[in-house]
């Protein structure tokens, strides 16, 4: 199975995986509106891949089979200053 990956024109480091290039039929309209104009990044055979950058390959495959798409959002940023202040017992 081929998988097409698109990056969001509105949200940084947000990617949408779909089963077919330029086929967004399974993606909810509200998600597409939030995502903005999809910009093609790559098309690859997902069955041959053992891993992906950030996303869990098994979760991506399962989502593509069940829902027809997978949305990858960036992990939350860690506030190192807040963690350090908390470790020192400093409260705002």
UniProtKB/Swiss-Prot annotation:
The record's section on Pfam families has: YcgL
Q: Where is the YcgL domain?
A: 1-85
Q: Which PANTHER family match?
A: PROTEIN YCGL
| Name by which UniProt lists this protein | YcgL domain-containing protein Shewana3_2381
Q: Which organism is it from?
A: Shewanella sp. (strain ANA-3)
Upper classification of the source organism reads:
Bacteria, Pseudomonadati, Pseudomonadota, Gammaproteobacteria, Alteromonadales
């Amino acid at each position: 199975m081929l998988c097409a990956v698109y990056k969001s024109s509105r949200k940084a480091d947000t990617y949408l995986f779909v089963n077919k290039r330029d086929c967004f039929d399974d993606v909810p309209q509200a998600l597409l509106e939030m995502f903005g104009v999809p910009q093609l990044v790559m098309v690859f055979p997902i069955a041959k891949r053992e891993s992906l950058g950030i996303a869990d390959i098994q979760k991506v495959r399962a989502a593509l089979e069940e829902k027809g798409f997978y949305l990858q959002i960036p992990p939350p940023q860690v506030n190192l200053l807040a963690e350090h202040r908390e470790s020192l017992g400093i409260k705002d």
